[in-house]
Amino acid sequence: MTLDSYIQSLHGKSITVIGLGVSNRPLLRLLLDAGYTVSVRDKRTREALGEDEAAALEAAGCRLMLGDGYLAGITEDVIFRTPGLHPFTPELAAAKARGALLTSEMEAFFAVCPCRIIAVTGSDGKTTTTTIISELLKAQGHRVFLGGNIGTPLLNKAPEMTSTDWAVLELSSFQLHSMNCRPDIAVVTNVSPNHLDIHPSYEDYQTAKKQIFLSQGCAGVTVLNADNAITRAFAKDCPGKVRFFSRETAPENGVFLREGVIYRSHNGEKTKLMDAESILLPGLHNVENYMAAFAATDGIVSDDTCRAVAESFRGVAHRLEMIRTLHGVTYCNDSIASSPTRTIAGLHALRQKPILIAGGYDKHIPFDKLGDEVCRHVKALFLTGFTAEKIYDAVTKSPLYDPKTLPIRKIDDFHEAVLAAAASAEAGDLVLLSPACASFDHFKNFVERGETFRSIVNELK
């Protein structure tokens, strides 16, 4: 199916687009250009959306439902939902029960994409892994379209793609939930408790992650983390071939680490790929990210290209990103760390105990393990955001906590917390923003949080 034929297949149907986020805007433009009248629903008020934008949308043929009642009275035949809106929301469930098609911009892209697709999901590491896969393919000479949760929306790019290109997608549990997708290669980096403020249960979250491979068919390839009990168990449900990556075991097929060396394994026969210490990005979690990417591109990207990218790629913004060193103090931005496991991985990647700034939006994830790791690996702790008290409790209740060696301050204002952390630092210290929480308490997303941190740090004298 082409993009044109997909858009034409909607002829005669009433359509609503829920959420005016980045991914839905090109979709909306395609629908309007095709002459459809579209209902646009967004939880923002008209004032928050902006009068100019609201008027422009109405002039283009949109009917707007904004604010608190934006989900009321859904009678349309086709519903494009924003990824952050759970499909079991009562209004959506009722619409689906009466026969409405509940879909998304990303599901539409899978339907029309003419090229091969590698899709990546996971609780942690998916953005870096997705980016590494893209870099590997580009370095091998392939044309790559990077999208999903990163890059740009790809639906309107489909006409530019050919069968020899690659689309590399980062997919969240929100996007995957109830979505029909058949990537040629699926990657699940790991699964740990996350987004439990949205998903009704941890089991529901796991089920969403499995959607990335369940419809693949026998020709598909799924790459799984052998060291994560949940993803390891996913293998029995994979309809196609399975490759594992591991720091702990040597899989029959996949990529693994043994005594500092990364190996490929094909039917039990291992060949050396590279020394792990040659990877420019710091930390064992990045070794895992590379192993996942190497497994996904096995047979597509040469070993020489794998080594060249690993030795030169400097990483993605907001992921253990060194911003500057001032008066001997180094400032590191790990705003992407929106879960305890991600912050723990960052702490393990560093070669010294940082002054840590943590806290943010509450996703109802336990902080017990984080408390122990903070006691082991942090010099001083500055807490901010909605979860400050929860993290404080986890740290101070840890049997490893010693108030004499780990000072803790709780500061409501993010800006003030950063300034206080900087003021406490001495030459040789590292100040690390790694919140262990989402950003939605005070920021639109982790990017805005990271850029705010960068701005504050760059203004320091």
Question: Where are each of the predicted segments found?
Answer:
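C-terminal helical cap/extension that packs against the catalytic core
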Residues: 53-55, 370-428
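Phosphate-binding loop of NTP-binding sites
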Residues: 71-74, 83-226, 230-241, 256, ...
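N-terminal leader/targeting and accessory segments in enzymes
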Residues: 1-104, 108
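Nucleotide phosphate-binding/pyrophosphate-handling subdomain across enzymes
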Residues: 3-14, 24-34, 143, 274-379
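Short internal beta-strands
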Residues: 37-45, 222-226, 357-358, 377-386
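Short beta-strand "acidic-cap" motif of Rossmann-like dinucleotide-binding folds
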Residues: 37-42, 146, 168, 244, ...
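Residue-level signal for inorganic ion chemistry
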Residues: 31, 79, 120, 149, ...
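Beta-strand->loop->alpha-helix junctions that form or flank phosphate-binding loops
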Residues: 42-43, 65-68, 103-107, 239-257, ...
